[in-house]
Amino acid sequence: MNKRFFPTLLLAFVCSTLAYADGGMWLMQQINGQVARMKSLGMQLEAADIYNPNGSSLKDAVVMFDGGCTGVLVSNQGLLLTNHHCGYDQIQKHSSVQHNYLKDGFWSYSLAEELVNPGLEVEIVDEITDVTAAVKKELERIKKPSGLEFLSPRYLSSLAPEIVGKKAASRPGYRYEIKAFYGGNRYYMFTKKVFRDVRLVAAPPSSIGKFGSDTDNWAWPRHTGDFSIFRLYADKNGNPAEYSKDNVPYRPKRWVKVNAQGVKEGDFALIMGYPGTTYKFFTADEVTEWSEIDNNIRIEMRGILQDVMLREMLADPKINIMYAAKYASSQNGYKRAQGANWAIRRRSLREIKLAQQQEVLAWAKQKGIATTEEAVRAISKAIEGRQDLRMRQRYLLEGILMGIEMSNAPAADSDIADHWDDPARREAGLQSIRKQFEAFFNKDYSPEVEKDQLAIALLTRYAERIPAEKQPISIREGIAEYGSAKAYVEMIFDKSIYASRERFEEFMKNPDRDRLLRDPMSRFAASVAYEHQKLAKEVAAFDAPLAAAQRSYVASVLDMKGQPNLAPDANLTLRFTYGEIKGYQPRDVVTYGAKSTLEGVMEKEDPNNWEYVVDPKLKALYEAKNYGRYANSDGSMPVNFCATTHTTGGNSGSPVMNARGELIGLNFDRNWEGVGGDIEYLPNYQRSIILDIRYLLFIIDKFAGCQRLIDEIQPQF
């Protein structure tokens, strides 16, 4: 990693008053400090309408969906809107070649037709409590601290029973979560209702919900109907409960009214949701590490993975269903890394962070605070010290563990090997291996694709990048013995009992201890896992001193700026952000408007490119201009719009509300130029990409003919 400093640029940035430009993402309890500015942009709400700790507010209608997305309640029957890509896994699990809901969409026309989704959870925040004093008191009592407890969600949440009482903490259907903010300088507890009976109600075809797919991802203008619809169910008393046929639709204490009157450039926009991760307090060296190691390796290895997957998906519909979710997930992180690196280079984000760093150091020096400079030096030392380890770790993670499925093959433990002659223990061990095999050899895995393409391509590149002496022993010895990654992979699939179901079942009929222990795929997986654990431990040695230094550095920033003026980094907790509906100029001579229409869908149509196929029914509606009440005043059909709000991953599915707190859209993406907003908000370039609620309603009504949902939502025209 190259360390580069730019003294001339630094002076220019310092003189430009760039210190922590802040577009959000604000904590709910910071609402009072933002209301005046929000009203200056046109908002007509009061603070208590958005967040009221003593009553209902918009906060109560915004949910966390499936641990990493956001959703919004829009009826008194627990109807929930989120993005198509947020519900993608559930849609995929219900899909088959015979009932391909990914391709054709899914529409339930009664409650009885709604589909159950085991394992899916939705959370609603009930209370938010400042527990900083209590947490710091408990942290002081730790007898053998690891040095990271002050940031650990698991450890922090384990303190909840001491804070709220053991009886309260054991309430069925509730979860208490304590998280660190500002690098561990503040702590808040979130009391949540957890719903586990969440049913799929509707989803458009992927040709609508994923229109433009990976080519348009992170891009504006956009033309995507990115939504899916679910419903929360509760027991007959209205409490969260596990699935039961006796459960009834949940009646929330608050839902958001839907406004179908349309939007215009300059309108106020409010977004609430669960942004995942940002890095606004990074030092310059941390930006360099993120770009040159994390992002560069992700771009390289996922590019190889995705090229192979896409080629195979286009050739076989069965493979397409099998790998659809994996490909979408990989592509999302890939393009995010590309966009972040573009912003770091073109928008000089490293230099901006260097300027901010110097500003904090100058402030601390003036105040006589020596710990700030010590913290910056400690951060740089940790980054430099872990450079080679982190590089090896990232190649192993992106290239092997996340890319090659056989790294998840079953591993025979010492218990079955040592007690093979004990029939009971041998059988128990074999059943454990069967369970591992079933988890590994699921419907989302193709041995043929793995053997012939994926494993060879990724393992070849990994071996080119990592010196042999630093590779997992199975990879090092296998490539040396067989002459190439290709020959090594072919040997594994030729000999492993896990290479096919037939071979596995044959082994289970006549199990052999030596064959089990010598299995090449199992040894590959065990060797990779060992190397991963070894690297994780070595990298982790830098975690505690780095976290302590970051905490000290952020404490100085917090003291300098003051908490009311400084939003903390995102960490999957409920936030709000606000701005206006507005286009932008990404580069010279290029200007983008704020809204897109169905006309743009037809302009992009390409029957020979799966990303831009237009459903015949949608095309017929377009040709007839059969838009009903959902059209713009000029007769065009709205699809998407963009706003200056500050969002990131986790905000997918976030409600976008107007000046009166009425739903006008669903956030689903960011523009390419704004991905760097995870480090520094860039108001002239950063845009949230939003599904216009009228397009969602139009698809439900005119495309699907699902009148019961329109009747339930009761949009205001």
Curated annotation (Swiss-Prot):
Family affiliation: Belongs to the peptidase S46 family.
Organism from which the protein derives: Porphyromonas endodontalis (strain ATCC 35406 / DSM 24491 / JCM 8526 / CCUG 16442 / BCRC 14492 / NCTC 13058 / HG 370)
Molecular function per GO: dipeptidyl-peptidase activity; serine-type aminopeptidase activity
Gene Ontology CC annotations of this record: cell surface; extracellular region
EC code(s) of this entry: 3.4.14.-
Site keyed Is essential for the Asp/Glu P1 specificity of DPP11: positions: R670
Keyword Hydrolase: yes
Gene designation: dpp11
Gene Ontology process terms (BP): peptide catabolic process; proteolysis
Signal peptide: 1-21
Role played: Catalyzes the removal of dipeptides from the N-terminus of oligopeptides. Shows a strict specificity for acidic residues (Asp or Glu) in the P1 position, and has a hydrophobic residue preference at the P2 position. Is likely involved in amino acid metabolism and bacterial growth/survival of asaccharolytic P.endodontalis, that utilizes amino acids from extracellular proteinaceous nutrients as energy and carbon sources.
InterPro entries linked to this entry: Pep_S46, Peptidase_S1_PA, Peptidase_S1_PA_chymotrypsin
Phenotypic consequence of R670D: Loss of catalytic activity
Known regulation of activity: Enzyme activity is completely blocked by diisopropyl-fluorophosphates, moderately by phenylmethylsulfonyl fluoride (PMSF) and 4-(2-methyl)benzenesulfonyl fluoride, and slightly by pepstatin in vitro.
Protein name listed in UniProt: Asp/Glu-specific dipeptidyl-peptidase
Main location: secreted
Locations listed in the record: Secreted; Cell surface
Active-site residues per Swiss-Prot or TrEMBL entry: H85 (charge relay system), D226 (charge relay system), S652 (charge relay system)
TM region(s), chain numbering: none
Lineage: Bacteria, Pseudomonadati, Bacteroidota, Bacteroidia, Bacteroidales
pH-related activity note: Optimum pH is 7.0.
UniProt entry tagged with the keyword Mitochondrion: no
Gene3D superfamilies recorded: Trypsin-like serine proteases
Pfam families named among the record's database cross-references: Peptidase_S46
